[in-house]
């Protein structure tokens, strides 16, 4: 079924793993400024004799095919079948070869990469092609090296699949599974907040993915709705590991400039450089409430001070009594006055109050003092999830929640895409939405 990504070097001839793909599209995975520490694994000279990447005619070195135990996900079979019928595909085409993939359309562009919707000529399945331009002097960006290195070792139903790597003289292309959408786009199509049942399923999958990577000693460091991909069934997968880092237990010194500002925890905003898995838990808590409310918790700010003020309005200003060591952090300001008192989360975000145990879980994730935050594994067994089938806790890492009988999304309360599907006779295609 697949191939293993070479853990030592990205170069023509390396072994890149491939697994059957599923799901649909997502927006561009962006890089953000980070530290410039040495690469996780050795990288050879960026240049090669192969031709440069062209989205419609890829030429690159071949890769050795190896087996994989990762099961197939669920892609949009209706759209995929139409593409299969219109494009040639051959099982004899090699993995790692540029000619094995065809570009269909551009999905987005980031600071160092462009993402295309594509199709594999090997098996006719949809893929997302993340094309990274290599600077003649600097070679491959460290974020790309880091992402490939980490994804190689992460094998889980709630982690995006890296099928293949295509290396040419001018570009490095990651071939990912093609997901239907991302959580940000999904919420924009269903404004006003998501169905509470669907929030529970999405949140369980998010925490399941986080519990897995944290157990593997990896921090994501850039959780936001745009980096959570969704299949047409509702499978949620963590994506964009460009800022992710292998971590030490319990903490390590890193850059404080991590996580998009709206989802950045107060300890990182205050300049803390020693953190562990609680960094991701704060972001997950923000996303949890955002799914209920339909809008970000702390939006519209342009600098760290304003972001902190918005957080203090809800949690209250921390003191040495409530947060030991807070006054020693670089961005701590002893003149914050008047000190707001903590508020109940359901008073600030009213939809939490309509779902039993939701506020309690959210409050355990959004603690100012990092060590007080619940872990992902602890959150998974919170009473908020007690209504879900017990079989979900016995699933192998590679198994989707939706393999359990009766687990499915419910129709959203507001669906802006319903009229489009009706006009195009697609009402029965995505039944889950």
From Swiss-Prot:
Its cofactor is Mg(2+). It is an enzyme of class 2 (transferase). The gene is Cdk15. Residues 52-336 form the Protein kinase domain. Keywords: ATP-binding, Kinase, Magnesium, Metal-binding, Nucleotide-binding, Serine/threonine-protein kinase, Transferase. Belongs to the protein kinase superfamily. CMGC Ser/Thr protein kinase family. CDC2/CDKX subfamily. InterPro entries: CDK (IPR050108), CDK15_STKc (IPR042761), Kinase-like_dom_sf (IPR011009), Prot_kinase_dom (IPR000719), Protein_kinase_ATP_BS (IPR017441), Ser/Thr_kinase_AS (IPR008271). Pfam families: Pkinase. This is Cyclin-dependent kinase 15. It comes from the Eukaryota. One of its GO terms (molecular function) is metal ion binding. ATP binds at residues 58-66, 81. The active site is at 173 (proton acceptor). Serine/threonine-protein kinase that acts like an antiapoptotic protein that counters TRAIL/TNFSF10-induced apoptosis by inducing phosphorylation of BIRC5 at 'Thr-34'. Its EC number is 2.7.11.22. It comes from Mus musculus (Mouse). It catalyses: L-seryl-[protein] + ATP = O-phospho-L-seryl-[protein] + ADP + H(+); L-threonyl-[protein] + ATP = O-phospho-L-threonyl-[protein] + ADP + H(+). Residues 46-83 are annotated as: Disordered.
